[in-house]
Amino acid sequence: TKRADEIIISQSQKKDVPCYQKMMTEVFSEMKRVLKDDAFATVVFHSSKAVVWNALCSAYSDAGFSVAATTSLDKSQASFKQVVSEGSVQGDPLILLSKGKGIHSSLHSQAILDEVIENDNSDTAKNERQIYAKYIGKCLQLGIAVEFDAKTAYDYIARKMEVVK
């Protein structure tokens, strides 16, 4: 890939979030153009930053896609970066996109995170990253802006779990 065509957020390449969103919108627009009307597109995406998730959402929405379903791809072994980086995410959301407008809930992002925490039956210390992935998926499916970066969500999850104990 030519550096100019690479879709990344990079200070050294002078590519900020709006540039990233614009380039992603172009990709999703081309996907929509070639995809049959009754077909779906699956996207695997990974980020620990809410602003990047919201750029992705705007990109596929602006291109005419909506989220039909989400799930999380839980890999059995995390990458080195996922293990050593504070605020890293584990469990890449799989996003099933369809042509057309999606739903937009009036729920608040924090209410979604609270619901995911409440419905989680696992050891939170081990699974805060999976809770975050589920939170992202639920926000995408309901058309709600992602408000929590991974690190902020992990701190919030820890506080909520202390209250429960």
Identify the residue ranges that each predicted region occupies.
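S-adenosyl-L-methionine-dependent nucleic acid methyltransferase catalytic domains
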Residues: 1-165
